[in-house]
Amino acid sequence: MSLSDHVQKLTSTLEQAKLVPGSAAALIPEGFQPTTKLEVSFANKDLDVGNFFRAGECKLAPSISFAAEEGAESGASYTLFLTDPDAPTPDNPQFAFWRHWVLPGLQPLSGGAVVAQTKPALTEFLGPGPKDDSKPHRYLFLLYREPQGLDLKKEDVGGEEFVQRRSWKPAEFAEKHGLKLVGVNWMTCAGDGWTE
C-alpha cells in the first residue's frame, strides 16, 4: 500500500474508532499527515490500521519497519510509543494512556524499510493484555522524529512496574522533548477468552 493510500485508510479508521477526533486527539492532531508508513508485525501478522488481534498473538515484541522520510536529515533517529487509550476498559479508561513500550534511537537503513535499533528501550515491551471480560482495546503505535542530540534516560519516561505504566501523558512527553509525530498505526486487541 502506498503512503497516500495508507494516509486515507488511517484517517478513515481513526475517525471510525473515535480516536481522532476523540480520545487520541491530543496525540494525533486532526488532519495529521504521516510522512512515513509505520509497519508493525507480530510473528508475521501485520498491523493494518485497526485490525484485530488476540492478546496471545502479541506476547513478543513486534518487528518495526519504516522508510526514511523524504527530505529528512541523514542519520535521523526516531522514537516509537505503544500506548493503550482504553485502560483498564474502553468504558472506563481511567488509566489511559497505558505505556506499553517506548523505543528510542530507531534509524531506517538506506534502500528500504529495515530499521536499526541504536539505543535500548526506555520502557521494555509489555504486550497488550486486556481482560477477557473487557471489550477490545485500541492500541496506538506512534512514531516520532527525534531532535538532534536527544539523549533520554529511563527515568525521563517513568518506571517499569505495572502500576507505574498507567496514566502516562504521551502528548506532554513528546512536546517536552521536541518529538515530531511522523507515523501512526494501530490495532484492536482482546483477551484470548473474550467473546462478543
Q: What kind of feature is each model-predicted range?
A:
Residues M1-E196:
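N-terminus-centered regions that define maturation/targeting leaders and the start
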